[in-house]
Amino acid sequence: MTLRTSNQLFDAYFTADGMAEVFCDQGRVQGMLDFEAALARAQARVGLIPQAAVAPIAQACLASLYDVDALGVAIATAGNSAIPLVKALGKLIASEDAGAERYVHLGATSQDVMDTGLVLQVRQALALIDADLARLGDVLAAQAQRYATVPLAGRTWLQHATPVTLGMKIAGWLGAVTRNRQRLAQLKPRLLVLQFGGASGTLAALGEHAMPVAEALAAELQLGLPEQPWHTQRDRLVEFAAVLGLIAGSLGKLGRDISLLMQTEAAEVFEPSAPGKGGSSTMPHKRNPVGAAVLISAATRVPGLVATMFSAMPQEHERSLGLWHAEWETLPDICRLVSGALKQALLVSEGLQVDAERMARNLDLTQGLVLAEAVSIVLAQRLGRETAHHLLEQCCKRAVAEGRHLRAVLADEAQITAELSATELDRLLDPAHYLGQAHTWVTRAVTEHFALNA
């Protein structure tokens, strides 16, 4: 199968191969042809058309039999992809079996073909995304446990705050992955449904056979049968797009964190290295976060596409003019971008390179200031909150002004040494002893992940 991709220079970077195949032109055409073949089988099952007509129709429902370029030219005149495809399908069937041709597309409308074909593609896309999310969850769970007790500087407003652990940070990424997997599972039965309403949504052309055909068609395609056709009720697709937007944003957060940890000034965590990866055309020393860039790019691009899906919701009456058309490329583009981000997230997370020694050195860049809160909390129990806070604030200012370690300044303060022994001060200024519930958060995130897998 030849993939007619939109941008071969960049697709390998921004799109996973599996998703590119789902949404290539042949994939679109095959989805629509699968609808037509299933429609014939369903109508024969309920006695609406002869059983003998099914085989000629089904045999013609292979995307490889059609000239995609010619279909593309015809779409520009027809206004949608189903019209020229159904004409080509009928012509091909008639060349082999003139009697069977009359039963093609019976009772359906173009949007039935296109929407159901899209749902069949979305089912494949959903399976790919869910599998990658599950795999990413496994990787992050392992990494969170591996680094559960490794301290690094917590950063708020891009400045050192109090110590956290790398495992806790990774557990945060894991929690988002788990929630997004839960969202996909919840929307799946709403999303994977048949579109079948005929001209204006009533299936009047099929008379008393309408519901039996609809039920049989849904069964043939292994899709749910909705309470009614949804030609201009697009919330199902928009909900899917919105969840993909959440996934892109969550992956963007992961990419942003890693890229910041890779900065020269931090140099604590790195993407896996490989020959030719992350280099510069002019600077031999560079090690750029090329994987994180894809995650951040997707998180930047997808929200605008999701907004397009939301903007296309108020569709007119029983068939939309233009708003439906706005979805055609938008949802596939969202799927492509999320697939590429997931691909890179897996590569980055699996090969994460960690410099724990650098983390420890960075924790001490402020010479103990990141642990001022730890001292203040204990001192407050003995001197009162306001007194303790004011005293520590003055000591911190003095440490900065004099370029000294906070531990040394505290040792010079009689009011503090009267309350805290040298051993207590040493312990309070040890990052490993001020990690709070960091390990608990890791355990809870990992437990929730594996509970979802059970």
Which ranges hold each PLM region?
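A short, charged helix-loop
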Residues: E215-H231
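A glycine-biased, small/acidic residue-tolerant capping/turn segment at secondary-structure junctions
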Residues: Q51-V54, A266-S273, K343-N362, H389, ...
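Glycine-rich cofactor-pocket loops
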Residues: Q145-G167, V269-G279, H285-K286, H317-A326, ...
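A glycine-rich, basic-preceded beta-loop-alpha segment at the flavin cofactor/substrate interface
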Residues: V104, G224-P229, F270, A307-E318, ...
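Long, amphipathic alpha-helical stalk/connector segments used for oligomerization, subunit docking
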Residues: R301-R385, L391
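A conserved active-site cap/scaffold subdomain adjacent to cofactor or substrate pockets
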Residues: Q233-E268, G276-C335
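A helix-coil-helix interface module used to build multimeric assemblies
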Residues: T2-A204, H209-A214, K277-S280, V290-I296, ...
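Short, well-ordered beta-strand elements within core beta-sheets of diverse protein domains
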Residues: Q121, M168, V238-L246, A374-R382
